[in-house]
Amino acid sequence: MKPIVEVFKTNVQHPELAEQIISILRRRLPVSRINFDLEVCDKILRVEGEQICVETIIEILSSRGLACEVLT
């Protein structure tokens, strides 16, 4: 099965916060590859895996007061 890649625009500014979010997401998506690119203006979150629930990822960030939307 070919992996799915979802890319999100966020407002995560700091590497420490990005690591916390990655840790939380890895508990929910243990076999996914997850990373942030904080160097670009959209503060990109990239998730790659066989099954990705976009709504869950957005909900996890939103519940922590963070903006998160699918980058189209």
Residues covered by each model-derived region:
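C-terminal structural segments of small proteins and small subunits
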Residues: E6-K9, E19-I22, E48-T72
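A short linear hydrophobic-aromatic micro-motif
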Residues: P30-F36
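Short glycine-/aliphatic-rich beta-strand segments at the starts of folded cytosolic domains
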Residues: M1-Q13
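Short amphipathic alpha-helix segments
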Residues: V12-L29
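Short Gly/Ser/Thr- and Asp/Glu-enriched loop/turn motifs at secondary-structure junctions
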Residues: L38-D42
